[in-house]
C-alpha cells in the first residue's frame, strides 16, 4: 500500500507516533488509509449538509475494512458571489480545489480518496485532482435542492434572479419579490434545475466516478446517505483491486459524458470543465468533439431553465442511468466505474419511468444536442450557446452591437432601460485573463429575461454563463478581449450576426478593418493583486478549458 510510505519500517517510528496521536490502533495501521475530502460549509446551501454525507462515507470505509481520515477544502456559492467582485474567484477556485486535494493526498500518502462535493467548481476541481493523482478515487455529489413553491407554482433560484428585472419593469410587486426571495431555495442541495452543479454531478456519474444514481438523488433523501455509505465501501474495493482514476477517465468516458450532456441540455460550463478534466487525465478532447456530438445527439430532457422539469423530476424518472439507457446504442458501456464494475450493468438495472421527463430518441425535445459550438470572425477559436434554453425564433439574429467593458456596466444599462429590441449586447474583458476569472453573466441575462427582452435581444461575451441562463446568450468567445481577440475591437453599432443552425458568429466588418483596429488596440490597465494576479498570468483560454499553464 502507498500508505506504507508513512507507517512501515523502523525509520517510520516517529511517523507512527504522530498517527497514534490521532488515535490509531495496531489493527488500523495494517489497513488502507483513505482520505475523505469534506467541503462542508455553513455559507453554501449546496454544502451545508455535507457533514452528514461525509459521516456516511466514513462509515462505509470502516465497514469495508479501511481507515477514513477526514480532510477539508474550500467551497464557494456562485449565486452568492454573482455580480460582485467575488465572482472573479469562482472559476479560479476550481484550480484551488484541485491543488489542495493533490497537496493533502500526496503529503500524507493516502491509498485513495473520496471527495464529497456539490457546487459548480468543487465537482470539477475534485475530478481534476483525481485525474492528476491517478489513485483510486470516487466522488459523492451532495444532491439537488428541492424546488420551492409560490402560489402553487414551482420556483427556484433563477426565478429570483429574473424577478429583479420583472420588478424593475413593474411586472411584480415588492411583496411578490420578497415572497420569492423567501421561498425560492427551501433547503440544502445544489440549485434545483439542470444548472452547472447538477450538470457536473450528472457528468461525474456518466464518467463512472460516482455511484449509481448519485447525481439526481436529492440532498434531502435518505438514499443520498446510502449512496455515500456504498461509495465508502467500494473505494476500499478499488484500492484492493488497484483501480485508479485514469482507468475510468478514458476518452470513451468523456465522449459518453458529452453525449449525455447534449441529451440533458446541460450547462455550457461543462465544456470548460470536461476539457480541463480531460487535460489532467491526459485524454485528447476538444471543442470539435462537442460540436460533432451535438450534431448527432438529440436533446431528450426539457430541464429547467429550458423547460419545466427539475432534478427531482429527473430522479423520479430514473435519473442519469435512465437517460443513458435511452442513449445506450451510442454509448461505450463496456468501460468500468471507479470500483471496477461495468457501466453496462448500471444501465441494465434501470428503466425510464416518465416519458415526459426523458423523451424517447424518436420524439426528442430537439433533434440536436442542447449545446452548440459557434465559430466565425468574432470567435475564431470558438464560442458556445445553450440551445436547450433558446427559442427557435432566436436561432438567427442580426442587430447592432451595444458594447460594454464589464458586467456591471451592462447590468446598469439593461436595468436602466437602455437596451432596445433587436440589439446585441456585447460584454467583454470578462474572460479568464480579462476578468480575471471569467465571471458568469447571470445577472444581465436574467435581467433581460425578466424585462421580456430574451426573445429580441442577444448577448455575446468572453465571459461565462450560469447553468441557469436562458435565451440567445453566446459565451466563451475565444480568443478573449484581454488577449487580443476580435471581440476587443467591436465598436458600438457594428452589426453582429448569430446563426445557430450554421454554427456562425460574425461581426459585419471586413478582415482588413478588424486587423487595423487590432493593430491600434492595447489591453486595458487595471490593478489586480493576490491570487487573481497569478491566475491572470497563468490561465489559458476558454477553448482549452481555462486551465493553468
Curated annotation (Swiss-Prot):
Binds 1 [2Fe-2S] cluster per subunit. This cluster acts as a Lewis acid cofactor. The active site is at 466 (proton acceptor). Keywords: 2Fe-2S, Amino-acid biosynthesis, Branched-chain amino acid biosynthesis, Iron, Iron-sulfur, Lyase, Magnesium, Metal-binding. Its EC number is 4.2.1.9. It is an enzyme of class 4 (lyase). Belongs to the IlvD/Edd family. This is Dihydroxy-acid dehydratase.
Amino acid at each position: 500500500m502507498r500508505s506504507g510510505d508513512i507507517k512501515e519500517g523502523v525509520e517510520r517510528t516517529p511517523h507512527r507516533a504522530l498517527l497514534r496521536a490521532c488515535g490509531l490502533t495496531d489493527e488500523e495501521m495494517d489497513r488502507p488509509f483513505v482520505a475523505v475530502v469534506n467541503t462542508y460549509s455553513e455559507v453554501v446551501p449546496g454544502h451545508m449538509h455535507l457533514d452528514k454525507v461525509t459521516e456516511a462515507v466514513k462509515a462505509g470505509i470502516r465497514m469495508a475494512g479501511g481507515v477514513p481520515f477526514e480532510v477539508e477544502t474550500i467551497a464557494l456559492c456562485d449565486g452568492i458571489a454573482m455580480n460582485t467582485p467575488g465572482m472573479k474567484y469562482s472559476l479560479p477556485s476550481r484550480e484551488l480545489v484541485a491543488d489542495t486535494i493533490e497537496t493533502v493526498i500526496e503529503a500524507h500518502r493516502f491509498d485513495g480518496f473520496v471527495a464529497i462535493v456539490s457546487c459548480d467548481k468543487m465537482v470539477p476541481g475534485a475530478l481534476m485532482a483525481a485525474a492528476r493523482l491517478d489513485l483510486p478515487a470516487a466522488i459523492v455529489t451532495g444532491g439537488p435542492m428541492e424546488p420551492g413553491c409560490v402560489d402553487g407554482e414551482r420556483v427556484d433560484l433563477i426565478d429570483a434572479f429574473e424577478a429583479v428585472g420583472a420588478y424593475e419593469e413593474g411586472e411584480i410587486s415588492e411583496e411578490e419579490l420578497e415572497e420569492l426571495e423567501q421561498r425560492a431555495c427551501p433547503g440544502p442541495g445544489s440549485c434545483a434545475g439542470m444548472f452547472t452543479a447538477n450538470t457536473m454531478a450528472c457528468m461525474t456519474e456518466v464518467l463512472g466516478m460516482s455511484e449509481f444514481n448519485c447525481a439526481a438523488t436529492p440532498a434531502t433523501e435518505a438514499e443520498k446517505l446510502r449512496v455515500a455509505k456504498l461509495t465508502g465501501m467500494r473505494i476500499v474495493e478499488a484500492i484492493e483491486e488497484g483501480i485508479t482514476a485514469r482507468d475510468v477517465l478514458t476518452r470513451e468516458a468523456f465522449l459518453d459524458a458529452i453525449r449525455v450532456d447534449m441529451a440533458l441540455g446541460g450547462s455550457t460550463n461543462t465544456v470548460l470543465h470536461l476539457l480541463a478534466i480531460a487535460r489532467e487525465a491526459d485524454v485528447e478532447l476538444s471543442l470539435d468533439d462537442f460540436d460533432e456530438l451535438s450534431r448527432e445527439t438529440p436533446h431528450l430532457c426539457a430541464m429547467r431553465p429550458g423547460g419545466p422539469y427539475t432534478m427531482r423530476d429527473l430522479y423520479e424518472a430514473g435519473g442519469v442511468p435512465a437517460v443513458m439507457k435511452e442513449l445506450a446504442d451510442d454509448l461505450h458501456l463496456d468501460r468500468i466505474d471507479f470500483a471496477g464494475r461495468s457501466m453496462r450493468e448500471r444501465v441494465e438495472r434501470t428503466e425510464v419511468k416518465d416519458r415526459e421527463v426523458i423523451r424517447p430518441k424518436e420524439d426528442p425535445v430537439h433533434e440536436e444536442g442542447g449545446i452548440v459550438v459557434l465559430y466565425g470572425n468574432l470567435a475564431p477559436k470558438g464560442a458556445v450557446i445553450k440551445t436547450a434554453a433558446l427559442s427557435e425564433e432566436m436561432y438567427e439574429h442580426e442587430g447592432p452591437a451595444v458594447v460594454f467593458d464589464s458586467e456591471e456596466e451592462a447590468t446598469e444599462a439593461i436595468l436602466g432601460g437602455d437596451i432596445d429590441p433587436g440589439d446585441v449586447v456585447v460584454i467583454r474583458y470578462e474572460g479568464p485573463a480579462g476578468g480575471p476569472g471569467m465571471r458568469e453573466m447571470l445577472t444581465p441575462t436574467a435581467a433581460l429575461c425578466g424585462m421580456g427582452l430574451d426573445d429580441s435581444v442577444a448577448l455575446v461575451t468572453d465571459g461565462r454563463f450560469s447553468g441557469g441562463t436562458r435565451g440567445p446568450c453566446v459565451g466563451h468567445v475565444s480568443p478573449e478581449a484581454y488577449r487580443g481577440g476580435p471581440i476587443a475591437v467591436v465598436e458600438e453599432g457594428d452589426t453582429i450576426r448569430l446563426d445557430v443552425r450554421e454554427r456562425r458568429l460574425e461581426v459585419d466588418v471586413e478582415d482588413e478593418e478588424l486587423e487595423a483596429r487590432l493593430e491600434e488596440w492595447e489591453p486595458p490597465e487595471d490593478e489586480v493583486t493576490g491570487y487573481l494576479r497569478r491566475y491572470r498570468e497563468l490561465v489559458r483560454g476558454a477553448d482549452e478549458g481555462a486551465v493553468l499553464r
